[in-house]
Amino acid sequence: FTNYVHRVYATHDGEVYPLPINLGTINQFFHAHYTPAEAQKLIAGQAGELAGTDPANLNDKGIQLIGRPLYEAFIKNYTGKQWQTDPSELPAAIIKRLPVRFNYDNRYFKDTWEGLPADGYTAWMEKMIDDPRITVELGVDFFDESQPYNKTALKAAGVPVVYTGPVDRYFDYELGDLKWRTVDFKEVRYDEGDHFGCPVMNFSDADVPYTRAIEFKNFNPERHDSQNPNKTVVWEEYSRFAERGDEPYYPVNTDADKALY
């Protein structure tokens, strides 16, 4: 594995800020020099009546965690683009994954070890399944009864199955469709060696139609000498509701969805 450490940045109102929200983000946003204790007091005050509570929905949890000004700058519109669902109807667990730090640590994760497969995920997966006891079948439709490894045949044979697809599809939508989000990617090529200077750039403002952009070469700085110094590839992510036949990425998981299944 490489020694890659994941860091994310966000644009808001013409400026670039470090994520997750940390003391650097707070001081830059408020043009201040708060100490950790001062920043904690500030955020608690800006959380208002939600301070010290444990809200169940994303909107209130976001305000409780980082105060209303930071929530409206970095989370509200980004969430609107990503989910197209009123934040008050989304579970708080979505934003609980985003840490808030009252220091200058801008690592996205707190794991002891981080890294990416040195030869890429394809080589990594190929090694994992390189065993005579493992057979990989591609292009198989689990729900097509004309194919050997289909749901009906495997169930009749009593074969244990770990199904990782949409649960509503598994039950043939007999209880209705769940809401899922999917992502469309737009590839953009730039005639420059590095466009963002980081692997992931979030776009927090509503006037930018995509949620974030990924610049792949920045995931592998150890390959810098072998990369094209005059070209770079960026993928912009556009989030929308998934329809049947789309690849679902995220369950919306509203109370209505949870009540179905």
Report the location of each language-model feature:
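Conserved FAD-binding subdomain of flavin-dependent enzymes
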Residues: 1-4
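Aromatic side chains
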Residues: 9, 71-74, 78, 83, ...
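Short linear motifs in exposed loops
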Residues: 20-21
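Mid-domain catalytic core of redox enzymes
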Residues: 140-261
